[in-house]
Amino acid sequence: DYKLVHHCRNGRSVYSFCMCPGGTVVAAASEPGGVVTNGMSQYSRNERNANAGIVVGITPADFPGDVLAGVEFQRRWESQAFDAGGRNYCAPAQLVGDYIAGRPSTALGSVVPSYTPGVRLTDLSACMPDYAVAAIREALPAFGKQITGYAMNDAVLTGVETRTSSPLRVTRAKRAIACRWA
């Protein structure tokens, strides 16, 4: 169990989320035309890979508009991932070394992705806002200095995990049972 955090020059924070030893990257989409990933481990934790989410902090300022703007923001990137994955529910993926260098991946290395129905090697930058791309590019080498092998060149980034937090917040009034959108 570990927690990695990197505070980037662009003001964003990047952190590891939900490390799954001996785990699998799984499909988690709930709507057609979107790709969403998540990670899990079986009880035995004996699969060939470990996986962890890499998360960039966002705020409501990143998706201004009405109360459902966060949902639309999430759907946008899930749709972009669907397109980048080949529009067949394969997930877009990229090797860490290629991601940091800003070039699309064309062949896997020693790490075999676990995502079913499969991955399509590409450039993940099409699936995230520019500030997230830059933040993760900066954070990965820093994480690699903290945990040997974390940012190895042929590790596989499989995207996108867009549901670490709810895109909508419902608050309750302190002295009533009524709810209001926030």
Protein language model annotation of sequence segments:
Residues D1-A182:
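Residues forming the flavin
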